[in-house]
């Protein structure tokens, strides 16, 4: 590797990975509830293991949803439909342990501190307080058209295409569980110049050879996802490097909601506040705050105000207004942090109810985000991925 160059690696997983099964079940339940009761409070956690699904959490709603049916339908859609996979949508046990949201939390969400103390500026927006304290990050970079870091973008692309090859029976020996990883080489100007390493581990039928899998992935997977200009004779490929991946899914490893937070976001390229997304209604700022921060970051880069930016927003439980907002452009902007923050505050309402209204979050849009990343999804119409405020933001800041 040339002097002053460096490597960065990100990973993704398929929709059949145990942790992603759990995420998708949690979000499928959330969608089912919020489609009937947009104001429901949902904090839904799922655990999957051999032959068993446990759904637990706190849900406050006036509607009924058939949780076992949602669980089985989700597992079936993912592709676990045979007992020999060690996990079958029809025969697995489904247990539920659901309580209501704590009234101590509810009182701070239902009526924010600003409203309770008489300091509200906008009564309708400040009536809702943050569902928890915490810090969230949003990130954007001009490395890709989607304004995402290249390593995670390619890792997601490989995982998504691999799933397509399985579900369309193009490669009918593939099974649902899989992981991908991409290492990108950056030059001295921090621009991606080549792919150094690709790792793919995919569950498969026991009778297929590793040589056939490797041949097929080089034919049907890599050329469909990765621009040939990034590949060279020194690019390394590791395909099922253990030599066998027959036992997978919940039979191989237990899965849990919220255990793939780096896969869900920026692949480690940006910081993470620690809060997971799936199974949480939009009053939970772990989710809505991170979506809003991405929305802000993406519009800053789309406006040409920075080449790369990380936005942090933080909240106190039961308080509507963020306790802090910070913006780091890594030296790629001609404008000060305060100039950018002033522009953001003028255009983006980062109070929980403001975010919910701005991004129209009381809708069943979450199940689709629970695999292959929440950001940079050009295959989906996600409100936090829009750059509709870029021009207005530019006019506010550029004098």
From Swiss-Prot:
Chain sites annotated for binding Mg(2+): 19
Binding of ATP, residues: 17, 177-179, 244-245, 253, 259-260, 276, 280
Catalytic reaction(s) noted: L-methionine + ATP + H2O = S-adenosyl-L-methionine + phosphate + diphosphate
Coiled coil: none
Binding site for L-methionine: 58, 101, 253, 284
Cofactor(s) annotated in UniProt: Mg(2+); K(+)
Single Gene Ontology MF annotation: magnesium ion binding
Family under the similarity heading: Belongs to the AdoMet synthase family.
Name the UniProt record assigns to this protein: S-adenosylmethionine synthase
Species in which this protein is naturally found: Listeria monocytogenes serovar 1/2a (strain ATCC BAA-679 / EGD-e)
GN (gene name): metK
């Amino acid at each position: 590797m040339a002097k002053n160059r460096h490597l960065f690696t990100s990973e993704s997983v398929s929709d059949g990975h145990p942790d992603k099964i759990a995420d998708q079940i949690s979000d499928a339940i959330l969608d089912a509830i919020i489609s009937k009761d947009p104001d429901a409070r949902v904090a839904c956690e799922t655990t999957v293991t051999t032959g068993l699904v446990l759904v637990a959490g706190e849900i406050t709603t006036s509607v009924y949803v058939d949780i076992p049916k949602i669980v089985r339908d989700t597992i079936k859609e993912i592709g676990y439909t045979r007992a020999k996979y060690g996990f079958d949508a029809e025969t697995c046990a489904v247990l539920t342990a659901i309580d209501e949201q704590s009234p101590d939390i509810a009182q701070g969400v239902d009526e924010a501190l600003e409203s309770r103390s008489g300091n509200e500026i906008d009564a309708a927006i400040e009536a809702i307080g943050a569902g928890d304290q915490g810090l969230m990050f949003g990130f954007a970079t001009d490395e890709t058209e989607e304004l995402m870091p290249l390593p995670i973008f390619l890792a997601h692309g490989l995982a998504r295409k691999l799933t397509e090859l399985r579900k369309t029976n193009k490669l009918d020996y593939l099974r649902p569980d899989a992981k991908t990883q991409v290492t990108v080489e950056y030059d001295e100007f921090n621009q991606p110049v080549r792919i150094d390493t690709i790792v793919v581990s995919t569950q498969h039928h026991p009778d297929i050879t590793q040589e056939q899998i490797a041949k097929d992935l080089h034919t049907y997977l890599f050329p469909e996802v990765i621009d040939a200009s990034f590949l060279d004779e020194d690019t390394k490929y590791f395909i099922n490097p253990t030599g066998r991946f027959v036992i997978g899914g919940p039979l191989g490893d237990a899965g849990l909601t919220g255990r793939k937070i780096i896969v869900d976001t920026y692949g480690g390229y940006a910081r993470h506040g620690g809060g997971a997304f799936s199974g949480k209604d939009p009053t939970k700022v772990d989710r809505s705050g991170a979506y809003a921060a991405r929305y802000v970051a993406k519009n800053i880069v789309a406006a040409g105000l920075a080449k790369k930016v990380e936005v942090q927003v933080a909240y106190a439980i039961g308080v509507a207004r963020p306790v802090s907002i910070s913006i780091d452009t890594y030296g790629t902007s001609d404008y000060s942090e305060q100039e950018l923050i002033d522009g953001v505050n003028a255009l983006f309402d980062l109070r929980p109810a403001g975010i919910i209204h701005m991004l129209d979050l009381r809708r069943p849009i979450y199940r689709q985000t629970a695999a292959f990343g929440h950001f940079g999804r050009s295959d989906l119409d996600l409100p936090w991925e829009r750059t509709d405020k870029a021009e207005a933001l530019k006019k506010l800041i550029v004098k």
